Amino acid sequence: MKLFINEFIKDYKKKTTWLYFLLSFGIILLNSYFAKRQFEDGIDAVKILSGITVVSAALALVFSLIMLANNLSQEYSKGTIKFLYTKPKSRSAILTAKIVLAFINYIIFLVVGTVFDFLTKYYVFFDRKVGLNHLNDTIEEGYFGRTVAKQLIITNLADLAVFIFFVAMVVLVCVVFKTQILSLVLVMLSLLGTGLIQSLTIFAVSKFSWAKYHMFDVPLFSSYYASEAGRNTVKEFFKFDNANALIIMLVAYSVVFFTISYIVNARRDITID
């Protein structure tokens, strides 16, 4: 616990952490502005509220992974791990603390961002017309007949599951190669290069059914639960008839990545640069 608290304090003493919060607020405000323009003819409070966490979740994922990659790369270059030549258990404890901190950072960014998004939409952009009284309203169509509250719970749990996979991937790359750049490139490729990767996957799946099981298709898990349109796309183009294969992929890749990371982290000969 002391180790985790120490890592937490170190993170929130950094100016870059607070810069990430400011960037998040700026992006959220910009998104709210465009949302207001979109609903000039009439406010759909249910639709707006049901997607209130979308931007915050995406930003939380990106910034918490950047912080994790930076923390791990610094640990191997000038941190405590560098000097723990004969204490693999201590190395594993430090690695675990940083992984746990990544999840805490994700939740903090998600909650703070969502609260900020809601308050600015409620008081600034939509003149108190997007309120919590709509949480029990049913979304009209395309969302499995869910209420707003149920939609928020399901989508955020699915996003959190996918976040576990991304954390495992970042940790693996940082531990094995001791660099944050490659890990961030992989994450950004997964997030920003989705269109290209999915186009190639759709083509490959039409030729070889096993091609759909590559790691960059794991994020489809959140798409499967996000909406009816998303589920239909996953089924029709990527040939996942249900979520079982996606769950197995998510768990399998995450377990393998974490296992390799801990083994390498415990056995690596760490040299002083």
PLM feature segments, named:
Residues 15-17, 90-91, 179-183:
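Membrane-helix interface segments
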Residues 29-37, 177-218:
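Transmembrane helix segments
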Residues 27-71, 96-175, 220-247:
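Secretory targeting signals
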Residues 21-24, 98-99, 187-188, 250:
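Residue-level recognition of transmembrane alpha-helices
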Residues 20, 228-273:
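Alpha-helical transmembrane segments of multi-pass membrane transporters/translocases
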Residues 4, 71-108, 270:
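Helix-loop-helix units of permease transmembrane domains in multi-pass membrane transporters
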Residues 1-21:
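Aromatic- and glycine-rich beta-strand/loop motifs that create alpha-glucan
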Residues 74, 87, 122, 175, ...:
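Transmembrane helix-loop junction
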